[in-house]
Amino acid sequence: MRQRLANGLPVASLLPVSTSLVECSLEERLEACRRLAVESLASPRRFWLREAGLLDWVRPPDEAFVGEMKQGDVSWFSGGLLNAAWNAVDRHAVASPERTALVWARPEGDVVSWSFRELRQASSRMAQVLLSQGVRWGDRVVGHLPETPTLAMLHLGCARIGAVPVAVPVRSGGTLGRVLRATRARVLVTADEAPLSEGRLPLWERVEDLLGGLGRVESVLVERRTGAPVSLVYGRDQELGTALVRARPTCALRPCDGEDPLLLVPGLEDGPPVVHGLAGFLLCAALGLREAAGIGPGAQVLCTEGFSGPRIDVLWGTWVLGGALVFDERGDGAHRPRALGVTHLFGPRGALAAAGPGVLGASLDGSDASVAPVWTPEGGGMLSARFGDLGGTSLFGVDPVLVDVMGRRAAGAGSEGELCVKRSWPAQPRSLEQDHAGYVAQRLERFPGLYRTGLRCRQLADGALATTGLTPLGGVAPSNVFPIEGPIGRA
């Protein structure tokens, strides 16, 4: 029987993850993914309730899926209770407290490593600070931060207490005001500047210019990243570092429903953030990374796109599996993967090519281990994956179809069209923040019975899908400022 904390959360209840998959051949990965994909469509209830065991639950779900897709009435693992911070960090801090959880590559040139124990303590401090600012379950907390451990602490600190973090990429400054208005957030976490390879971005100046017209923001926590001058407003602003030092390094975990929201910033889209279901997002992100990319304990993952947009699925999925993340604040990690201990590199082809021979087609030890996924534009993991020249497969629960502008199905090698999905899957976006009618109109109404992904794809001779572009959803560009398709290389 599992031990449990006072609040019902399990202690040291880690289920084994497929660490051997890290060394699997591409053929073995492709075979496993195809087998699981077929099973997920043939017996979805049995498949998803079994795979839900990858997560620790306070109360396991009784059903996998309830609802119908026509009006976006979609619910996965509802009634089940869990906590994302426990699944991502705390359970690893119990089982392997000194294992590396985070590697921070700083622009100053040094590299700092954090263990799961240290990350649990740091995220608990962040949670205590947020509680002191009046943040409670369901509250949205907006972050506008560089790729530092503070960004990780924000994601995890919110998750501990059931709040909803919304991270706005520092290169998407024009998005910040829109996100603050859409989420009605009262708390903003930012930094004085973001030191990037092309120079320093003045984040605080951007925030100051914006907050004058946003009276709803009551508290601004400011990280002193570079020491640039910051004029704090008494009663509203405070230095985050000082608050963290004063906070306790422990904080109770709040159980959350499987359908509690997880929000993603929609990149180029002019609309509100995209809403996901918490459990389905975590499970699909982790399952895809485990089976397609072979990530598990000991993996060290670098994502060149960062963790403030749709690829926070890489963040949550890697940590659920017990791997470590490289926060590449310098932005040159693809050029020095060995120095950072990178085992898995996520990014566009150009970044992977910069990593040196072997990353695109083979690893640095000479073995071929490249995977080319088609990512969902709005987070939640991979829709399908190609494994070198061996072929590809749709991934778990995804029943894809290509359609033309009239909704006619396209099939066969060389066919091209908009990628839609014929049934709900756990990582399907649930809504748009404060605009469910817009979600239904953009993604569900044009082709009844299908979910529009916003991707244009071509079917290859081996049956795999390759992304060819984007399709506007209801006249609005799909929500992904990052490259949709890109290989995963074993560095």
Q: Which residue ranges define each predicted feature?
A:
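Conserved AMP-binding/adenylate-forming core of the ANL superfamily
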Residues: 85, 102-155, 172-177, 236-245, ...
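Conserved AMP-binding/adenylation subdomain of ANL enzymes
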Residues: 164, 280-300, 307-344, 385-388
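AMP-dependent adenylate-forming
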Residues: 21-25, 65-66, 88-115, 227-231, ...
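Conserved ATP-binding/catalytic segment of the ANL
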Residues: 420-489
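Structural core segment of the AMP-binding/adenylate-forming
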Residues: 156, 160-241, 332-355, 487-490
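A short helix-loop-beta submotif of the ANL/AMP-binding
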Residues: 127, 140, 146-170, 183-187, ...
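Gly/Ser/Thr-rich phosphate-binding loop
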Residues: 232-234, 238-244, 320-323, 337-390, ...
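Conserved pre-ATP/AMP-binding loop-to-beta segment of ANL
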Residues: 98-100, 221-222, 227-271, 276-286, ...
